[in-house]
């Protein structure tokens, strides 16, 4: 069955919003549109279940059940146990909680590997542990391509490395990193692995159980959901790290790294993300676990013409691979004008795009790009239409 873009777009109310008509959305990496099931669940929760969950009366029990439904459904798609899925206010906040746990867990002189390719969320919290005597080793990127070479990691690994942190996919380079290969190398050296999946998850939730990292982080609001950070913490590591929650919650894995009460309504609404992914697969006659492949195939089909058009332009530097199959549809280009300025010009042609450094300051500097100049970032996902791609290409012709 051919990918049904019309059906997909019907699941996102933003496409029927009068104030957005005629505008093509190419800033999905900053936050995707929200699917209807999430909005419906959030609305229902505030209408009929906005009470303390897990209590003795029906509304309270329904509230707790819906929160559990979110965790159970996400765990099914992520290939992990239900209690290995935790929620928090954002990925950055979740990483700071994890960094605090590792600060207590590690000894002075032990090491953490971080990359130049990461968004600051999976970099800054770990680097701050240097203040406590933890050695920070930097896995550098290729200054021309932004590529993160696994062979370079081998040179950084030894018995003192306890944790390796890297992105599944950079939010400016766009290249998809070989998580399974990198994780296996880190594990062989005795290190745990933390993967930032924020820029990858919107293009298909990974089978975390299969690819193997000990921690996998992503953001619901960039994955068609509400503003929540979602983290998978595998059982062996989650039980070994010091509890960061109330002492009486220490025996419940999914509570150990949620220091404060979660946003009940938004956690419950995350079940709508699962509703959508299941419906997407069913509509196309696929198993629910095949939803990710459906999304990915459609994105690759739309992405290659954009990459070709940008690669063939003078005075345009494309960051990351020019092959759609090896990257996410998060496309950053360096121009002779500041990225934000070009994004403003594109808006006059009905294109919603982003310009700036996108909290990837270290990556841009490593590639010789002034963060204040920034990049133009064009990012989309599976619900983007061919018509919108054509609109973008025409706008780029006019502006560049």
Name these PLM-found stretches.
Residues 1-400:
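Pyridoxal 5′-phosphate
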């Amino acid at each position: 069955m051919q990918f049904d873009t019309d059906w997909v777009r019907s699941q996102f109310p933003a496409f029927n919003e009068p104030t957005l008509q005629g505008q093509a959305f190419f800033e999905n990496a900053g936050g995707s549109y929200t699917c209807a099931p999430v909005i419906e669940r959030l609305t229902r929760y505030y209408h009929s279940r906005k009470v303390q969950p897990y209590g003795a009366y029906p509304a309270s029990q329904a509230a707790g059940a819906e929160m559990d439904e979110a965790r159970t459904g996400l765990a099914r798609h992520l290939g992990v146990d239900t209690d290995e899925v935790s929620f928090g206010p954002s990925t950055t906040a979740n990483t700071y909680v994890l960094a605090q746990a590792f600060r207590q867990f590690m000894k002075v002189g032990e090491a953490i590997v971080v990359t130049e390719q990461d968004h600051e969320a999976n970099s800054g919290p770990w680097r701050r542990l240097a203040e406590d005597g933890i050695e920070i080793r930097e896995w550098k990127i290729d200054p021309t391509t932004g590529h993160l070479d696994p062979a370079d990691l081998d040179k950084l690994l030894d018995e003192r490395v306890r944790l390796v942190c890297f992105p599944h996919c950079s939010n400016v380079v766009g290249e998809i990193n070989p998580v399974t290969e990198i994780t296996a190398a880190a594990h062989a050296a005795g290190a745990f692995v933390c993967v930032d999946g924020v820029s990858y998850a919107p293009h298909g939730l990974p089978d975390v159980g299969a690819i193997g990292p000990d921690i996998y982080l992503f953001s619901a609001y960039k994955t068609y959901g509400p503003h929540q950070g979602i983290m998978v913490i595998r059982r062996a590591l989650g039980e070994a790290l010091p509890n960061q929650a109330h002492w009486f919650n220490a025996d419940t894995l999914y509570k150990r790294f949620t220091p404060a009460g979660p946003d009940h309504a938004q956690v419950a609404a995350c079940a709508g993300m699962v509703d959508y992914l299941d419906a997407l697969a069913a509509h196309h006659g696929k198993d629910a676990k095949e939803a990710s492949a459906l999304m990915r195939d459609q994105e690759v089909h739309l992405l290659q013409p954009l990459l070709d058009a940008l690669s063939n332009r003078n005075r345009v530097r494309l960051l990351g691979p020019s092959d759609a199959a090896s990257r996410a549809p998060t496309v950053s280009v360096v121009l002779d004008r500041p990225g934000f300025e070009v994004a403003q010009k594109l808006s006059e042609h009905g294109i919603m795009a982003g310009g700036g450094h996108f909290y990837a300051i270290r990556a841009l500097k490593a590639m010789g790009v002034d963060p204040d100049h920034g990049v133009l970032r064009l990012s989309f996902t599976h619900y983007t239409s061919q018509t919108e791609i054509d609109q973008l290409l025409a706008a780029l012709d006019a502006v560049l």
